[in-house]
UniProtKB/Swiss-Prot annotation:
The keyword Aminoacyl-tRNA synthetase does not apply. The chain crosses the membrane at residues 21-36, 101-115, 140-156, 203-218, 237-252, 457-472. Belongs to the PsbB/PsbC family. PsbB subfamily. It is found in: Plastid, Chloroplast thylakoid membrane. GO terms for molecular function: chlorophyll binding; electron transporter, transferring electrons within the cyclic electron transport pathway of photosynthesis activity. The gene is psbB. It is a multi-pass membrane protein. This is Photosystem II CP47 reaction center protein. It holds the Pfam family PSII.
């Protein structure tokens, strides 16, 4: 047939059997990729330290999605909390991965069967004997089945009625675990950070899908609407399907980047806005002040801060710090976190507390500035020592650590003070192991960043695909050069311009 590569889908345009076949093969590839990718990630995943080396620091992509649906156990004898377990069963990382690969194989065989046995009686219109699909009825079937699945997920899986529930955590990503979720039917269900909205929206959307599916199965479209929306053309189905997919891709890119109940920070890492707004810094300060008000010392107050919370308050975990051309997990950048050194408190020689100005998200380098409680610069690390008035040496800055591994330790040596001032720019101070993975010190993005970037790119691509195929199906007659309202018989080949009597070809 000699079709160019971008026209090869033409072969399934009027071939329902092979149209089913290629869709089965596509689903087989998707399912096979998911299972294989899960096995690969499990092979390289280190579950030993869920606090300082969580899955999102290791660049895991499918494991967070499996975990948020309630899978927490592995055949390797561990669970997501780092504990040892026995008898994980089929509802485990490897069990679900294996079922996807088995499903992929079955779909592969089904695809081959439908490719070979493409000319089934089922696909022929009994009135004409030609291949035909009842697209409005197929639409009703798909809508009904997807509505049933949507309702089942919300009513049974998420609520724990028949299933584990989903991953639920607090706003600061400390107490996350899999638990049943009650549907939220009030206005609070529209809060994107309320897990109850996930249950109620799936139940509501599922019921709507079931009813709409039944409607389309029982009611035939009016002929004028059928013609106007090109309901008989398979390319109409393609166009509207692409529209649904690109819209979904745009939505999930937003919920991932800005955060939501469906994208918990324990599984995907923090959002960039939590760094920009000082979200974790403020919570830590609030907890410290509460401890001090309760009679605790500074050391006791900072020691009570969970290491997990302190680790979130570190710029290296900001997904916007990684570049799009820096491949690999976060651990390949700054290294594997080994421990929290503690909270660094800086003071000048007169005993006034100084605060290091934190680095904004979109800076690679930033001047080291130490400010007093009024925001006035009192010390810095100057670029030109000769013109310096506020150097660490001149101001006599010292640093004392509270909490962490260096609890109670004070450094007065200017070189050491400057080292920790530079590191305090990046948030709480942590020690990293850069040798194990040969980490290069250049920040990487988290799976949150990669998911957002990938889905935005595909959404844009699919948006243009929707416009392209929509235009092709709506203006098919125009592109073909045939006017649908043409009354007279057109003799093909009689005119230089199709259907234009003024351009009749002259006999040679």
């Amino acid at each position: 047939m000699g079709l160019p590569w971008f026209r090869v889908h033409t072969v399934v345009l009027n071939d329902p059997g092979r149209l089913i076949s290629v869709h089965l093969m596509h689903t087989a590839l998707v399912s096979g990729w998911a299972g294989s990718m899960a096995f690969y990630e499990l092979a390289v995943f280190d579950p030993s330290d869920p606090v300082l080396n969580p899955m999102w620091r290791q660049g895991m992509f499918v494991l967070p999605f499996m975990t948020r649906l309630g899978i927490t156990k592995s055949w390797g004898g561990w669970n997501i909390s780092g504990e040892s377990i026995s008898d994980p069963g089929l509802w485990s990382y490897e069990g679900v991965a294996a079922t996807h690969i088995v499903l992929s194989g079955l779909l592969f065989l089904a695809s081959i069967w439908h490719w070979v046995y493409w000319d089934l009686e089922l696909f022929r219109d009994p009135r004409t004997g030609k291949p035909a699909l009842d697209l409005p009825k197929i639409f009703g079937i798909h809508l009904f089945l997807s509505g049933l699945l949507c309702f089942g997920f919300g009513a049974f899986h998420v609520t724990g009625l028949f299933g584990p529930g989903i991953w639920v955590s607090d706003p600061y990503g400390i107490t996350g675990r899999v638990q049943p979720v009650a549907p939220a039917w009030g206005a609070e269900g529209f809060d994107p950070f309320n897990p109850g909205g996930i249950a109620s929206h799936h139940i509501a959307a599922g019921i709507l899908g079931i009813l709409a599916g039944l409607f389309h199965l029982t009611v035939r479209p009016p002929f004028r609407l059928y013609k106007a929306l090109r309901m008989g053309n398979i390319e109409t189905v393609l166009s509207s399907s692409i529209a649904a997919v690109f819209w979904a891709a745009f939505v999930v890119a937003g919920t991932m980047w800005y955060g939501s109940a469906a994208t918990p920070i324990e599984l995907f890492g923090p959002t960039r806005y939590q760094w920009d707004l000082g979200f974790f810094q403020q919570e830590i300060e609030k907890r410290v002040q509460a401890s001090l008000a309760g009679g605790a010392s500074l050391s006791e107050a900072w020691s009570s801060i969970p290491e997990k919370l302190a680790f979130y308050d570190y710029i290296g975990n900001n997904p916007a710090k990684g570049g799009l051309f820096r491949a690999g997990p976060m651990n390949n950048g700054d290294g594997i976190a080994a421990g929290w050194l503690g909270h660094a408190v800086f003071k000048d020689k007169e005993g006034r507390e100084l605060f290091v100005r934190r680095m904004p998200t979109f800076f690679e380098t930033f001047p080291v500035l130490l400010l007093d409680k009024d925001g006035v610069v009192k010390a810095d690390v100057p670029f030109r020592r000769a013109e310096s008035k506020y150097s660490v040496e001149q101001v006599g800055v010292t640093v004392t650590f509270y909490g962490g591994e260096l609890d109670g330790v004070t450094f007065k040596d200017p070189a050491t003070v400057k080292k920790y001032a530079r590191r305090a720019q990046l948030g709480e101070v942590f020690e990293f192991d850069r040798a194990r993975l040969k980490s290069d010190g250049v920040f990487r993005s988290s799976p949150r960043g990669w998911f957002t970037f990938g889905h935005l790119c595909f959404a844009l691509l699919f948006f243009f695909g929707h416009i392209w195929h929509g235009a092709r199906t709506i203006f098919r007659d125009v592109f073909a050069g045939i006017d649908p309202d043409l009354d007279e018989q057109v003799e093909f080949g009689a005119y230089q311009k199709l259907g234009d009597p003024s351009t009749r070809k002259q006999a040679v």
